[in-house]
């Protein structure tokens, strides 16, 4: 697999290099997905597989042989002994005893704990588990252990950062116990600070409190940075405030967007280059950690390249319909603290007269006004409704006020709302004659039976905040079918619906029969409001008044609507969490010409809403056996995307999203093929596996060949 990666990067490891900058880095995401298969030696030479503790949910995996293990051990001893001394010392380990019945609770921490035992003359474990499997700090046990030690014998307290804080430090602070370690004792902790982000405790306060509880100086509390992908290489804190790279390591900082090497003093993603790994391609690893290289010498005379960790690259925001696959479709029930009901109503668009003082009274007044307009709306010809929507769609495209929505699906919406297209939809939905919406007409192929399509009445919409444009598709169809509409928008709406609806004001449309419809009058049948999810009574009022309920959003959002009381004959339409994928049958790939037309359609589907909407696929399954192979179709697709981008411009991409695209490309550099723009505006990823992959967003399409659909 690494050979394939090098070929993809046009790198020949057998040719001389002029700088380590030329070595293509492997992103940590590769070890999360492919770690077990990334062996550089025959599998029979592997002795074990190491996994990270997976603070991000998916553990990294590296496979180890005897040579790698020996190198790791030597590197670790050299670095750590400089900070705690070369002589073995008693180790007070703040974790589960791997020999105990509770060893399963130790999990992936086992490898890290046992790795430090080579520095120990005596070991005690002081994290215990009760009968329910809950961990607690054994205060009495550690006191007894310290009491038995020779007088003045320095010790080393070792543990993971979050365990030291959650189980040890908190337990001591909540009690009257104070421990007094002998002079020269150290506290070393590993694992990083990610699990403590919610605690909002600074490193300085952590060191100070921990030192006070154990009776040592804060300078003797040492945070050791390291990562599974290069196990054995440790970077302890120096008194200067930096970490030092040993003689085994070269550190680079790369720009989060361009991946170019940065000079000292510039903040970037840290890359570590080392000869230590022998059994897997972990010699050049690009981490998700953000840091700064320092080019000045250490004031304490310590050798080695200096760097500081300033944080971790944030994950790209999940923006899909209902947060697609955000938890692999496993939703955990979360208890919500009971909050006092909110009665505030924000009326964002309503052309009627407001009545009432409280939020509930005003909402009831809006509902009554909308229902009063229902008879008028039912008298409007469907041709007039379609015509005026078509005119407004042109305005959405031409008016600069709506330019901020063009890269969020407005172009697609405007084309979809063309009068000819809406007539086609109405004809198909109304048995071939859209005038069934207007009056009783003969049933098809019958002179005795008549048919008329009646509107339901009040349609209430609960809109999502991530892809507002999608909600307009449902609204337009509700208007054409002569329903009055009440929209409850998201707190993230930022006035999008108010702006879109205001475009109707001042527009008129006259049918061929001479009937004129004013957009302002039509907008008297629509209202837009916002109230919080804690405004339970208003949610129940809106739901109980609806003949149609349309809910958009994630599981929690749509479940909230579903739990509201409703009329017995109310129709509920849910656009909740969805998996978005596309399928191409072999018959559709009968020629290069057919494939090019299809590739254009696929690229448009991916680009509309920038994959934030459920209409945009993230995975594409292509049936084998066509004239055009799945891999060739990817090549054609790569030719189509730039043309589509010219039509549907790519919106701003955050550094976090660009990093996510880089990571996904890095994985496929190992296991498949990658096509994509240099600006990360689109990406096609191809591999032989056919599993449904987690969305990356930002026009990243994962293509899978399959034998049969």
Over which residues does each language-model region extend?
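Generic macromolecular interface patches on structured domains
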Residues: 12, 62, 82, 86, ...
């Amino acid at each position: 697999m690494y050979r394939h990666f090098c070929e993809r990067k046009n790198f020949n490891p057998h040719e001389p290099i002029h700088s380590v900058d030329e070595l293509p880095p492997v992103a940590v995401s590769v070890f999360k997905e492919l770690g077990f298969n990334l062996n550089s030696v025959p599998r029979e030479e592997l002795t074990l597989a190491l996994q990270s503790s997976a603070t991000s949910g998916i553990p990294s995996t590296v496979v180890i042989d005897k040579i790698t293990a020996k190198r790791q051990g030597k590197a670790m001893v050299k670095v750590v002994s400089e900070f705690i001394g070369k002589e073995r010392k008693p180790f007070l380990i703040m974790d589960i005893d791997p020999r105990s019945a509770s060893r399963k609770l130790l999990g992936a921490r086992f490898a890290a704990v046992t790795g430090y035992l080579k520095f120990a003359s005596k070991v005690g474990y002081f994290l215990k588990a009760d009968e329910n499997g809950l961990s607690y700090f054994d205060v009495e046990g550690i006191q007894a252990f310290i009491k038995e030690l020779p007088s003045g014998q320095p010790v080393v307290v070792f543990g993971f950062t979050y365990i030291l804080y959650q189980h040890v430090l908190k337990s001591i602070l909540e009690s009257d116990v104070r421990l007094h370690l002998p002079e020269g004792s150290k506290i070393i902790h590993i694992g990083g600070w990610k699990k403590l982000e919610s605690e909002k405790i600074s490193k300085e306060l952590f060191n100070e409190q921990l030192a006070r509880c154990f009776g040592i100086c804060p300078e003797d509390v040492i945070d050791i940075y390291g990562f599974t992908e290069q196990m054995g290489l440790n970077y302890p804190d120096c008194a200067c405030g930096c970490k030092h790279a040993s003689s085994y390591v070269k550190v680079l900082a790369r720009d989060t967007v361009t991946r170019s090497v940065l000079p000292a003093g510039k903040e970037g993603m840290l890359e570590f280059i080392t000869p230590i790994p022998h059994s897997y391609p972990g010699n050049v690893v690009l981490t998700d950690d953000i840091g700064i290289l320092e080019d000045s010498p250490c004031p304490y005379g310590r050798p080695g390249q200096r760097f500081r960790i300033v944080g971790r690259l944030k994950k790209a925001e999940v923006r899909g319909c209902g947060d697609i696959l955000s938890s692999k479709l496993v939703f955990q029930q979360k208890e919500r603290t009971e909050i006092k009901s909110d009665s505030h109503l924000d009326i964002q668009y309503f052309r009627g007269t407001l009545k009432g003082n409280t939020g509930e009274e005003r909402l009831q007044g809006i509902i009554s006004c909308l229902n009063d307009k229902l008879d008028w709306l039912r008298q409007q010809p469907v041709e007039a409704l379609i015509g005026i929507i078509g005119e407004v769609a042109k305005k959405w495209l031409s008016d600069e006020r709506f330019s901020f929505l063009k890269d969020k699906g407005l172009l697609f919406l405007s084309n979809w709302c063309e009068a000819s297209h809406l007539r086609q939809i109405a004809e198909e939905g109304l048995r071939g004659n859209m005038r069934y919406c207007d009056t009783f007409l003969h049933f098809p192929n019958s002179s005795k039976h008549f048919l008329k399509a009646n509107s339901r009445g009040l349609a209430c919409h609960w809109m999502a905040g991530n892809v507002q444009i999608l909600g307009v598709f449902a609204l337009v169809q509700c208007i054409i079918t002569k329903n009055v509409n009440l929209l409850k928008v998201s707190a993230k709406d930022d006035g999008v619906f108010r702006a879109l609806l205001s475009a109707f004001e001042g527009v008129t449309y006259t049918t061929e029969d001479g009937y004129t419809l004013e957009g302002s009058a039509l907008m008297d049948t629509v209202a837009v409001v916002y109230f919080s999810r804690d405004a339970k009574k208003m949610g129940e009022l809106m739901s109980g008044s609806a003949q149609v309920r349309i809910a958009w959003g994630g599981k929690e959002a749509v479940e909230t609507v579903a739990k509201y009381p409703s009329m017995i004959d109310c129709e509920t339409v849910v656009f909740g969490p969805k998996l978005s994928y596309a399928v191409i049958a072999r018959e559709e790939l009968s020629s290069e010409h057919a494939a090019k037309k299809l590739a254009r359609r696929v690229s448009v589907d991916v680009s509309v809403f920038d994959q934030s909407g459920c209409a945009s696929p993230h995975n594409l399954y292509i049936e084998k056996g066509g004239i055009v192979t799945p891999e060739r179709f990817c090549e054609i697709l790569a030719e189509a995307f730039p043309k589509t981008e010219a039509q549907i411009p790519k919106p701003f991409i955050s550094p976090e999203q660009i990093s996510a695209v880089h990571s996904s490309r890095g994985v496929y550099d190992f296991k498949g093929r990658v096509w994509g723009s240099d600006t990360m505006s689109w990406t096609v990823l191809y591999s032989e596996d056919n599993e449904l992959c987690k969305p990356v967003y930002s026009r990243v399409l994962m293509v899978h060949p399959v034998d049969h659909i």
